[in-house]
C-alpha cells in the first residue's frame, strides 16, 4: 500500500524532475479525489481551435460563488506546436476550486499556424473572454493573464506588446496582471524549433521577444521558475524581471527547486494545499492593482 505522504513525494518528483513537461505527467497527480467542476466551451472565432473553456468559481465546499470572482486566463504550453485546453482541465479545475473563474483558450499551432498568428489567436480570446466574464460571475477589475512555457511566451506578448490587443479594439489595461510560469521571454534563435517557429523577416526575431516590449506602463508581473529548468533557460526569467525593474514595474519572482514542470505542477491536487507557489499566485490574482 502506498501511503499518502509517499504518494505525494512520488508525484512531486514526477512533476519537478521532468525535463519535458507533458499533460499526461502533470495530469497524473489529479487522479486522486477528483471533483466535478462545471465547464462551458465558448467559440471566440470560426477556426477549429478558436475555442476556450470556462470553469466557474467555487466556494470552499464546491458551490458556485455568488459574488464576483477574480478571473485567470491560462494559456497552455507545448512548444508552439502541441497541447490542448482539455489536457490542462486540471489547471482550470484547480483555479475554480481556489475561487477564480478560469478561462483556458486553445490557439492555432505550428505548422499550420505561424508566428504571430497564434499570438493573435490568444489576444482575440483574451478580448472576447474579458468582454463576457460577468456572465460567468467574473470580476472585470481582476482579470489576470497566465501562461506556462510557450504559453507564457504567447501570454507575455499579449500582455506587453500593446499591438495585439489593439487589433481587438482594446489595450492591456483590461488586464490586472501577468503571471509567467517557466516562460520564454528573451531567448536566442539557436535551435531548429525556434528558427522554424519564428522564421521570417529580420524584425520578426525582435518582435518575438516579450522583453523588448516592457515599458513603465506594463502590467504588474509575477514570474515562477524552476532553478534547474533545462527546457527553458532560467535566464529568460532573470532578463524579463530585470527589464521590468528597470522600467519600475512591480514584479515578483518565485524561484523553486525543480525543472520545467514544477511551476504549473504546483496546481496538481496532490501539491496544491502545501504549495507556496499556489498561495502566492492566488494572492497576486486576488489583489486589486
Where are these regions (language model features)?
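Short beta-strand element of the alpha/beta-hydrolase
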Residues: 66-78
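C-terminal catalytic histidine-bearing segment of alpha/beta-hydrolase fold enzymes
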Residues: 238, 245-289
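Short amphipathic alpha-helix adjacent to the substrate-entry channel of hydrolases
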Residues: 86-104
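Mobile cap/lid helix-loop segments that gate and shape the active-site cleft of serine hydrolases
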Residues: 47, 183-213, 219
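Short beta-strand/loop motif that positions the catalytic acidic residue
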Residues: 217, 223-225, 229
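Alpha/beta-hydrolase active-site loop
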Residues: 113-133
